[in-house]
C-alpha cells in the first residue's frame, strides 16, 4: 500500500467518512462499513483529498488532457485535484465541470472552465449505479472528446444486481478504465495491520466473501 493510500484511509476514519457497524445500503444489503465522502467538508480536507486524487491519477499512468467534474460532487474534486497537480507535481492541468441547468445569460451554456476536449478523466467520489457517468458521457461525446478514465476515491469491489460491479459495467459500456485512491482490498489490508479492528476486519471479509467480485 502506498503512503497516500494509508493517509487517505486514516483521514477517512478521523473524519468519520468511513464508519464500521451495520448499515443498510440503498440496495437493501446490510454492509459492515459505510463511506460518506460528503464529510470531507473543510478546506484542509479538500487540500488533502486533492493530493490523494493527484497521486492516484499519476499512479494510473493514464494520458489525461483535462479533468471533468460532474455536478455537483465532482466539482470540488476536479478543482482541488487540478490545484494539487499544479502545486505538488508542476502539472498545469485544465479542468471543467457542468451545470445541472443551462445558463441563458453571461457566458451561457452548461460547461464552466476549460474547453472540453482531448482525453478526459472524470473525477467523482464513488460509483453506485453509474448514473452520473452516463450523463457525463453524453456531454463528453457532444464535445467530441474522449473519456479516457474515471477516478473515484473508493472502489467497493462488490457485485451489482448481476455478476459484475457497477464499476465493471462502466468499464465494459464505455471502454474506459476506472481507478480509485483505494479499493476494498486496500481497506482490508489496512485493517489487517490494526489488531484493535479485528472484529471489523472479520465482518468486512465476510461481506467481501458474500458480495465481492
UniProtKB/Swiss-Prot annotation:
InterPro entries: OPRT (IPR023031), Or_phspho_trans_dom (IPR004467), PRibTrfase_dom (IPR000836), PRTase-like (IPR029057)
Listed Gene3D superfamilies: 3.40.50.2020
Keywords associated with the record: Glycosyltransferase, Magnesium, Pyrimidine biosynthesis, Transferase
Keyword Transferase: yes
Keyword Glycosyltransferase: yes
Alphabetized GO MF terms: magnesium ion binding; orotate phosphoribosyltransferase activity
NCBIfam families in the record: pyrE
Protein name: Orotate phosphoribosyltransferase
Organism whose genome encodes this protein: Photorhabdus laumondii subsp. laumondii (strain DSM 15139 / CIP 105565 / TT01)
Amino acid at each position: 500500500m502506498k503512503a497516500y493510500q494509508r493517509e487517505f484511509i486514516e483521514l477517512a476514519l478521523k473524519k468519520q467518512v468511513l464508519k464500521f457497524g451495520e448499515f443498510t445500503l440503498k440496495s437493501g444489503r446490510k454492509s459492515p462499513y459505510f463511506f460518506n465522502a460528503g464529510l470531507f467538508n473543510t478546506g484542509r480536507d479538500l487540500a488533502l483529498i486533492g493530493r490523494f486524487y493527484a497521486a492516484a491519477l499519476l499512479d494510473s499512468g493514464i494520458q489525461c488532457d483535462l479533468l471533468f467534474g460532474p455536478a455537483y460532487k465532482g466539482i470540488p474534486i476536479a478543482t482541488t485535484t487540478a490545484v494539487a497537480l499544479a502545486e505538488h507535481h508542476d502539472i498545469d492541468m485544465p479542468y471543467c465541470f457542468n451545470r445541472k441547468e443551462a445558463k441563458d445569460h453571461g457566458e451561457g451554456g452548461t460547461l464552466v472552465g476549460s474547453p472540453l476536449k482531448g482525453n478526459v478523466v472524470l473525477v467523482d467520489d464513488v460509483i453506485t449505479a453509474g448514473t452520473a457517468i452516463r450523463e457525463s458521457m453524453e456531454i463528453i461525446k457532444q464535445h467530441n472528446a474522449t473519456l479516457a478514465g474515471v477516478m473515484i476515491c473508493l472502489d467497493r469491489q462488490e457485485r451489482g444486481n448481476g455478476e459484475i460491479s457497477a464499476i465493471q459495467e462502466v468499464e465494459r459500456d464505455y471502454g474506459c478504465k476506472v481507478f480509485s485512491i483505494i479499493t476494498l482490498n486496500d481497506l482490508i489490508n489496512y485493517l489487517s495491520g490494526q489488531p484493535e479492528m479485528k472484529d471489523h476486519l472479520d465482518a468486512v471479509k465476510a461481506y467481501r466473501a458474500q458480495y465481492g467480485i
